[in-house]
Design a protein with these regions (language model features):
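N-terminal presequence-like segments and the immediate start of the first folded domain
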Residues: 1-55, 59-72, 78-127
Length: 127
């Protein structure tokens, strides 16, 4: 098993690795909508927050020589599920190639770190 911290990756909000790799699978820790340059500072609204979360996930994957095309499963956590679900889906969908959407679970939660509106974690598979 390998524990990865990606140089230049998002600043952890708690004690964890950016990703853990075992048996060809890479488990990417849930990412927040802040940026490595502005830890703890979140943009307003689900559109900007979803974009930042996806950018952070891409950064972690790229640091491990992977991309979104290697993702087999995504889990999305929303604090305002009813209000933000449709817009989050529009932004989320824009990051994936046609016909290459991973399996996904999306749930409403009562709270996230930094009072974020969204968090996403991934499972990827090495080719």
């Amino acid at each position: 098993m390998q524990f990865h911290m990606v140089p230049g990756g998002p600043t952890p909000v708690a004690p964890f690795s950016h990703a853990v790799e075992t048996a060809g699978f890479v488990f990417v820790t849930g990412q927040m909508p802040d940026t490595p340059l502005t830890p703890g500072v979140l943009p307003e609204g689900i559109t900007a927050q979803t974009r930042n979360v996806m950018a952070n996930l891409i950064t972690v994957l790229a640091g491990l020589s992977l991309g979104l095309d290697h993702v087999v499963m995504a889990r999305v956590y929303l604090t305002r599920f009813k209000e933000d679900y449709a817009e989050m889906n529009t932004v989320y969908r824009s990051f994936w190639a046609e016909g290459r959407l991973p399996a996904r679970t999306c749930v409403g939660v009562t709270g996230l770190a930094y009072d974020a509106l969204i968090e996403v974690d991934l499972i990827a598979r090495r080719p």
